[in-house]
Amino acid sequence: MYKADRLYNEMMEVNEKVKSMELTDEASIAEYFRLYKELIYNHKWIGSVYDIYADDAVLRRENGDAYEGAHAIMQEALKFTAAFPDLKIHMRDYFAVKKGDEYKVWQYYTMEGTNRNQSIYGPATMRALKPEECITMSMATVRKINGTWRIVREFTMYSMECIKAACKPAEQ
């Protein structure tokens, strides 16, 4: 089997899990959003952002930047994965807590990948993210909108020092 076929099959397995899930409690909600994060970052199915973010969702980052709307959030994910095309996230912990008619979903994961492309971070450096240092924490508020659970607000904190180190050009 070709590598592309294997990667496609792996992605479709994750997609099938997502599509067949019954979302009934904290555990299933947490798993649903974990799988979507895997589709977006590990399989580069960036369009999945539109499946899990409300049209008017707001993503706030550690540096104070705010991305308003699913399209802006998709563009941010695309820019990040462009810099690290082999990016993989490793979910270390995740859970959800019901609060009224919403859930709060927490995720803690690490990232690995190599800065292989020209991007918003500058030219490719071929330096790797160090997963033991490249930690991400995220808290999202999800709500059922037109029958689908969607993120309406999210706060995500990347380890920017780790990302900057991987993107820093070599000393001349």
Identify the function of each model-found stretch.
Residues M1-G47, D51, D55:
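Short, low-complexity N-terminal intrinsically disordered segments enriched in polar/charged residues
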Residues M1-K17, P131, R150-Q172:
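Low-complexity, intrinsically disordered terminal/linker segments enriched in charged
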Residues A27, A83, I151:
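Contiguous, function-dense segments enriched for cysteine-driven chemistry
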Residues A30, R34, I46-Y108, G113-N117:
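A solvent-exposed, acidic/Ser-Thr-rich amphipathic alpha-helical stretch
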Residues I40-Y41, Y109, F155:
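Tryptophan-centric aromatic hotspots in well-structured domains and transmembrane helices
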Residues V58, T148-R150:
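Residue-level signal for well-ordered, solvent-exposed loop/turn and beta-edge residues enriched
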Residues A77, M91-A96, I135-R143, F155-T156:
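Hydrophobic/aromatic beta-strand elements that line small-molecule binding cavities or substrate pockets
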Residues Y109-G147:
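Exposed beta-sheet edge and beta->alpha loop/turn motif
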